[in-house]
């Protein structure tokens, strides 16, 4: 009998495997990304203190007013720019990118490129 692969379970396995190797410090916190069907979320986390330093999502008014639909690449790029702008204001310029088990493609790639354009280094 054939079984269809559970994509989210596979993503979680990839995420666990990557998280064993990646952790954010106070010098280089972790830029963590979560993607749903309709929105995208990004957080900058200091894993040593277990504190979220900066967060942004496509649910914020600044992003919602700039795009028609919040679940596309355009919205992801705006979220990347927004999280980078907030991070630079707090003095964070270098991060470790945690793609959350997602492939570096589409919305995840756009978020990363938007964050890089706005001043984050990773």
Curated annotation (Swiss-Prot):
Alphabetical list of CDD domains matching this protein: Ribosomal_L18_L5e (cd00432)
A GO CC annotation recorded here is: cytosolic large ribosomal subunit
Which InterPro entries does the UniProt record give? Ribosomal_uL18_bac-type (IPR004389), Ribosomal_uL18_bac/euk (IPR005484)
UniProt keyword terms in alphabetical order: Ribonucleoprotein, Ribosomal protein, RNA-binding, rRNA-binding
Q: Give the GO molecular function terms.
A: 5S rRNA binding; structural constituent of ribosome
Outline the segment boundaries, as ranges, of region: Disordered.
1-24
Compositional bias (Basic residues): 12-22
Q: Name one GO biological process term.
A: translation
Self-association or partners: how does it assemble?
Answer: Part of the 50S ribosomal subunit; part of the 5S rRNA/L5/L18/L25 subcomplex. Contacts the 5S and 23S rRNAs.
Name it: Large ribosomal subunit protein uL18
- In which organism is this protein found? Clostridioides difficile (strain 630)
């Amino acid at each position: 009998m054939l079984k269809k692969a559970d994509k989210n379970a596979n993503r979680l396995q990839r995420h666990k495997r990557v998280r064993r190797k990646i952790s954010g410090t106070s010098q280089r916190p972790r830029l963590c990304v979560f993607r749903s069907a309709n929105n995208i979320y990004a957080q900058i986390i200091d894993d040593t203190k277990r504190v979220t330093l900066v967060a942004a999502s496509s649910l914020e008014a600044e992003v919602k007013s700039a795009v028609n639909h919040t679940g596309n690449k355009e919205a992801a790029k705006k979220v990347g720019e927004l999280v980078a702008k907030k991070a630079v204001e707090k003095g964070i310029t270098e991060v470790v990118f945690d793609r959350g088990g997602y492939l570096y493609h589409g919305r995840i790639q756009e978020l990363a490129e938007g964050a890089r354009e706005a001043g984050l280094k990773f």
